Amino acid sequence: MRAFSDPVRLIPLLFAAAILAGAGLLMLPFATVDGRGASGVTAFFTSTSAVSVTGLIVVDTATYWSAFGKGVILLLFQIGGFGIMTAATLFGLMAGRGFGLRERIATSVERSRLEVGDARSVLALVFKVTLTVEGVVAIILTLRFMLAYDFPFEQALWHGVFHSVSAFNNAGFSSFTDSVMSYQEDSVILVPIMLSVIITALGFPVMQDVRHHGLSWRAWTLHSKITLSATIALLLVGFVAIAAKEWTNPATLGPMHVGTKLLNAAFHSVMPRTAGFNSLDVGAFRGETLLMDYVLM
């Protein structure tokens, strides 16, 4: 019982509980298309990958899992990305429980070293940013799938929401077999996904600075300045390196128009930030490009 009163011990317990619950749900017969349910290893691996927003898969998400199974996976990487400790903070606030310094520090560690401060304010920011970014990206993707690709509304909405939540949480899961390779020429699909990944990769401390100080660079904390500067530098280096190495590769950027080449080079400079989507065949990348990906990751 002592672990439940200690946030430092509670965090791994909650993650483990989410993984086990997710694995159990994925083993149910109606979680897979064939109606047989996933094996224990497949279910546990997929659940762990989703909660830890790793994005690694051992079966094709699009064809192996049923609508229920995909819904479970979406819920798992939303929980993982949001941070179970953040949810625990919410439950404590709803119950009227006060939070001391230890709880606030534990919450700060879980959500990318948030500044020790008012838990209510932090929680409100997390909810607001999450719902806003995921909602806006989901709407853009849904409309694009409907208007440009003639998806039925329900199908467009599903794919829009799935990719929006996956992108914001840097999960890398896709409801398409080829990730987003089928949309490598569509900036309306790729750019919102890129921006969502970048926003969440910056972290909530940076968002807090923006909320309190706007775009006043001098008023920002050193952490925010370093984070933003490093992010821009890494994106530029990745973009230039990928474009330079893959520009003439016939299996990746080679056959594309200049604008599409630049778009996909930019997309793949963002994705190593634990996002995991791909608009190009990563297996066809040149060795130097893969090395750059390793460095960026």
Task: Show the residue positions of the predicted features.
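Membrane-proximal intracellular helices of multi-pass ion channels
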Residues: 1-297
